[in-house]
Amino acid sequence: MLGLAGIAAGFIPWFLGNGYLPVTFLMYVCSPLVLVVGLSDCIGSQILTPGGKRAQSGKVIVAGAVVNACLNFLLIPHFAALGAAAASVAAECFITFLYLWLGKDFIKPGMLVRYGWKRLVAAVVMLGAVVWTGQFLEQVRGLGPITTFVQIGAGAVVYFLVLLVMHDVFLYRYLGIIYRRLTGQP
């Protein structure tokens, strides 16, 4: 989410051309979709469907489509593409909220905070690194694919290192699994 926002300013000019610079702000607006849609997809496929709530899940998706259509009808005439982007984000947030409500027996709000705060801190630090890397490379070599790919790589490394330093439980668990597989340990 924050990584997408971090590369937007340098990515749009070389990928779409300078005539599309207004799309940069739309990428900022749409960047929460990475987290929101990912969360709703996980809840839907990993919790609601196996939990026997597939029909309710389908109704939520239809309700989200209705919210999106209504918001598009209201916002696009006044805000054009920005209205469409905002409507999509709002509708997906609506779907995710309803999914969380349907899955409240499995996912408590405190769980999101307890397991998510380290990732949020890592994402904010990563955003700073991505933006700084982009600004530095823009001065040194200009905008282009190499700058964007270096930003992505730097962001991934910083995110990983921050989670490593913060002793993220999931990261250490999976590093342990990888280590045991590489060394042949059970």
Name each model feature, range by range:
Residues 1-18:
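Short membrane-interface helical motifs at transmembrane helix boundaries
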Residues 4-9, 45, 72, 100-103, ...:
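Alpha-helical transmembrane segments of polytopic integral membrane proteins
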Residues 2, 6, 25-52, 56-76, ...:
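Short runs within selected transmembrane alpha-helices of multi-pass transporters and secretion channels
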Residues 22-26, 111, 115, 119, ...:
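Residue-level signature of transmembrane alpha-helical entry/exit and packing/kink sites
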Residues 13-14, 50, 77, 104-105, ...:
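Transmembrane helix-loop junction
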Residues 61-69, 118-128, 184:
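Small-residue-rich segments of transmembrane alpha-helices in multi-pass membrane proteins
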Residues 69-73, 124-139:
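Hydrophobic alpha-helical transmembrane segments in multi-pass integral membrane proteins
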